[in-house]
């Protein structure tokens, strides 16, 4: 989950304050076991962060009731997130990294922070309801001898990456269903960059724009 909308990891020396900037909370790491059905429910809950694409939209928009730190992207599997579909039906083509379809009874070990584990995955809340089988807790405070997630990030950079990291994108997932005209989308992006259009702002700074730019918005330009 993204914990800050303003943090950046700039080229150069990485300092402890950089870890605190990109990960603002004192979370620890939990290790859970879940089956394919549970994983899909988790992913569908996260995918509700996006508003459903509607004809005429030329940018994506976000559910303004969902704070950005409640959105999780997933590694270790491949999937499409279809924003033309309603929440609960958006995760498409979910496979293992080798292309095998994920089945409901497949077993996964999933790393999440303690907040997500205790508020959503190990209790009945938004994702799982009474009667559902909950994921199994395998370990709390993983590598607690090192510290929390901030410290684990630093440890990973030092010991696994040899002290140097470079930008890398897995490309294991993508947004689909944004069926806009490419020229209209590019025009909207140009107008936004020129300051001739602006994205909507929400009262809660922890949420993202809840209104898409539309063909009607760009028609006057």
Give the positions of each predicted feature.
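Catalytic centers of hydrolytic enzymes
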Residues: 1-195
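Extracytoplasmic Gram-positive cell-surface binding/anchoring modules and repeats
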Residues: 186, 190-221
């Amino acid at each position: 989950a993204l914990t800050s909308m303003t943090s950046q990891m700039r080229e150069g020396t990485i300092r402890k304050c950089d870890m605190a900037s990109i990960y603002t909370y004192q979370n620890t790491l939990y290790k859970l076991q879940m089956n394919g059905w549970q994983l899909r429910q988790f992913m569908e809950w996260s995918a509700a962060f996006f508003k459903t694409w509607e004809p005429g939209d030329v940018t994506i928009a976000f559910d303004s009731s969902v704070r950005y730190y409640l959105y999780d992207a997933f590694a270790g599997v491949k999937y499409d997130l279809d924003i033309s579909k309603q929440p609960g039906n958006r995760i498409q083509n979910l496979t293992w990294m080798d292309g095998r379809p994920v089945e409901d009874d497949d077993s996964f070990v999933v790393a999440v922070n303690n907040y997500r584990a205790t508020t959503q995955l190990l209790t009945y809340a938004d994702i799982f309801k009474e009667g559902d089988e909950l994921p199994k807790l395998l370990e709390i405070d993983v590598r607690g001898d090192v510290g929390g997630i901030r410290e684990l990030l630093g440890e990973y950079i030092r010991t696994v990456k040899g002290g140097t990291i470079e930008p890398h994108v897995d490309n294991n997932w993508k947004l689909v269903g944004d069926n806009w005209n490419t020229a209209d989308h590019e025009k909207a992006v140009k107008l936004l960059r020129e300051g001739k259009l602006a994205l909507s702002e929400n009262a809660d700074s922890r949420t993202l724009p809840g209104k898409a730019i539309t063909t009607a918005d760009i028609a006057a330009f």
